[in-house]
Amino acid sequence: MAYRMDRQAYAETYGPTTGDRMRLADTELILEVERDFTTYGEEVKFGGGKVIRDGMGQSQQSRANGAVDTVITNALILDWWGIVKADIGLRDGRIVAIGKAGNPDITDGIDIVIGPGTEAIAGEGHIVTAGAIDSHIHFICPQQIETALASGVTTMLGGGTGPATGTNATTCTPGSFHISRMLQAAEGLPMNLGFFGKGNASTTEALEEQVLAGACGLKLHEDWGTTPAAIDCCLSVADRFDVQVCIHTDTLNEAGFVEDTIRAIGGRTIHTFHTEGAGGGHAPDIIRICGESNVLPSSTNPTRPYTRNTLEEHLDMLMVCHHLDPAIPEDVAFAESRIRRETIAAEDILHDLGAFSIIASDSQAMGRVGEVITRTFQTAHKMKVQRGPLPEDAANPRGTRNDNNRLKRYIAKVTINPAIAHGIDNHVGSVEVGKLADLVLWKPGFFGVRPELVIKGGSIIWAQMGDANASIPTPGPVHGRPMFAAFGKALAPSCLTFLSQAAIETDLPNKLGLQRACIPVLNTRTIGKAEMHNNNSLPKVEVDPQTYEVFADGELLTCDPAEELPMAQRYLLI
């Protein structure tokens, strides 16, 4: 006779199943399980008196015969493609299966074979996401990496050489010498990394030199002179070498207006940083570029979401980052021209419409490297409160039960979409078979704020951990700490370094003595907004030059600043 469990008891034992709902952190965002790949009555769970024991859930299969290295049991996966309950099998640092784990000798329908060589991670009651990708990094200090990792970020792309004045303002690692040193520094850092060369030049030689030196992309920044000639030159090099171009446009409109920049881009693929403009760009209307089909528009997190503090904090940040002098009226006017409540408010809504595709940090250069995921879901919460359910969620025939479509839209902004934009989606950016096992486990009450466990290349690299002298792992003080994969020779095989294909073909990794796997970026020049998952809307965006009001397809985009946010002071003292 079948044994029946109360739904609440089942969720507490094996995690939620199809139709169960949960709140994320202290937000108004509700997740509902869409499908359960496990089998009722055949669930696997580790522990005393539990299932994963010899001859029961654990088979006799060796690793050579197909047993996985690690199984994550009964995990609730939140990804751009769905929200499902499943077991996850890891092998050789990659995801090899998502489905049902167990012992095929006694159970049918097993996708993931558990053997004597298999480690178990309890996913029951946890949400699993792909490690986030921060694609707007100023590499000002190496301590950023630990802070980002502690927040659930496992890949960082950007530029810099340390706290140089140029790096403080621009995401560029200029020249072959600096690129080489940063690639060598990456060897000791527990993070997937890639570096952008400086793209500001009107002739190609110096740009080609940087791509051959290992740059995985090129960055155009107004502080180096983002002129139409530089834009055209940079894109021509990128097209030849298949690397992405990121752009911070001309706030002062000295070399041209937004129309001139669009003309210089000429329909070629480009990743526009802080597309709203507070982080920099043609004032006051750079935001309109998000309606171009070849543009991959992103935000940086200081404007995410629009709150009563947003405008006030921006002026001082901007003066410091861009080496401006408050005693010079022109410098103050430059700063003030970038900060507009109307465009920041519209940015919230454009994210909710899927017209902005990516969110990143702008680390220590007007952005906070440890808050990418937090601010992404704070924006989703604010839009749920102010705009209600998305039409796709409201269309559920059972009524508005969940925010699944909104959640899939926002998780894509920090995972798969930056991966696609930068040609690394074959390896990272989603919870899919074949991808690197860069996974983050969250307790639902701490989702987006503090990961419970970060897995990097199939090994635990960061975790919440208690007193090391305690008799069990849980006594306080409990806080995030680096784990074994972050140390010694385990670090190199757990992480990737992204380079241009041209650099790899010249045997650059061996010339520099690199031990980490060096992976080429691919397919960056034939993509567009259409490839941005759940975020490919193309409204016609217009800005009133007098009032700065923003319109999308003729509709005014405006919202109030948030007075209070979730995922904030209930969790964090500072």
Swiss-Prot record:
Its EC number is 3.5.1.5. It catalyses: urea + 2 H2O + H(+) = hydrogencarbonate + 2 NH4(+). The keyword Hydrolase applies. Ni(2+) 2 binds at K219, H248, H274. Carboxylation allows a single lysine to coordinate two nickel ions. Binds 2 nickel ions per subunit. It is found in: Cytoplasm. PROSITE patterns: UREASE_1, UREASE_2, UREASE_3. Disulfide bonds: none annotated. Coiled coil: none annotated. GO terms for cellular component: cytoplasm. It comes from the Bacteria. One of its GO terms (biological process) is urea catabolic process. Its cofactor is Ni cation. Pathway: Nitrogen metabolism; urea degradation; CO(2) and NH(3) from urea (urease route): step 1/1. GO terms for molecular function: nickel cation binding; urease activity. Substrate binds at H221. The active site is at H322. Heterotrimer of UreA (gamma), UreB (beta) and UreC (alpha) subunits. Three heterotrimers associate to form the active enzyme. PANTHER family: UREASE. Belongs to the metallo-dependent hydrolases superfamily. Urease alpha subunit family. NCBIfam families: PRK13206.1 (NF009685), PRK13207.1 (NF009686), urease_alph (TIGR01792). HAMAP family: Urease_alpha (MF_01953). This is Urease subunit alpha. It comes from Prochlorococcus marinus (strain MIT 9303). The lineage of its organism: Bacteria, Bacillati, Cyanobacteriota, Cyanophyceae, Synechococcales. The gene is ureC.
